[in-house]
């Protein structure tokens, strides 16, 4: 720890406090300190998971893990430092980001997620607060505390993942067999938030979250989601809503952008576009 000085608290992650610090050369780093409550408990499984995943992932749109320091009663992860997160940027840009900026961030996010998915890693907690941005306009995915290597076919996982507003309807209805489409749903929610300047589905509870999704995208049925009836929390008495036209709730997005968003926010996870397919979508054809 002697290598770093000038600690300044900048946030809290899934399981630890994050500080900004500098080394002797004046370079800035983000230090994530994980307190080890009891010596006999050892390192939290979430921390071990994040370390093992991040050590394997090397991509320009994924935050770099430089060092791991095992100090007395605490573990310190040394990450590259970025100036701010996407949530803060959206908050200061009244009415949403400029279309060229939103497009650039979305493409970078998809590139990072496609890389994760190719390496059999689900992030499981994508939200604007976990997307870091530097002054050059580079976006990097952070906070892999909930990430988990996935097998084929999809295994049964806990459904208590992803902050409520970015949680897919299949998870909300109790699906424990899920895969890459849960990250794509979150990406779609983030895309809409960048464009609109506010969250698309800001639910107050799991039930409220589902109802907000259904009121906009329509209630699932055997036509648009054949397997929905198999989910533990599916209710045949859900109120029936018809889908709204996209332009009524998404402002300032052209037809190709709406087409891409609609493919990310499919109710049925099996119908959602993959990250790799999304990168090839016509929406990005004008992007350098």
Swiss-Prot record:
UniProt keyword Zinc-finger, yes or no: no
Residue(s) carrying Phosphotyrosine: 15
Residues carrying Phosphothreonine: 14, 158
Annotated knockout phenotype: Normal asexual development in host erythrocytes, normal ookinete and oocyte development in the mosquito vector, normal number of oocyte and salivary gland sporozoites. Normal transmission into the mouse host.
Transmembrane feature ranges: none
Catalytic activity entry: L-seryl-[protein] + ATP = O-phospho-L-seryl-[protein] + ADP + H(+); L-threonyl-[protein] + ATP = O-phospho-L-threonyl-[protein] + ADP + H(+); [DNA-directed RNA polymerase] + ATP = phospho-[DNA-directed RNA polymerase] + ADP + H(+)
PROSITE patterns with a match to the protein in the record: PROTEIN_KINASE_ATP (PS00107), PROTEIN_KINASE_DOM (PS50011), PROTEIN_KINASE_ST (PS00108)
Compartments (UniProt record): Cytoplasm
Catalytic residues, chain numbering: 125
Function in brief: Serine/threonine-protein kinase. Involved in the control of the cell cycle. Required for entry into S-phase and mitosis. Probable component of the kinase complex that phosphorylates the repetitive C-terminus of RNA polymerase II.
Summary of subunit composition and partner proteins: May form a complex composed of at least the catalytic subunit CRK2 and a cyclin.
Similarity comment text for this entry: Belongs to the protein kinase superfamily. CMGC Ser/Thr protein kinase family. CDC2/CDKX subfamily.
This protein's name: Cyclin-dependent kinase 2 homolog
Organism annotation: Plasmodium berghei (strain Anka)
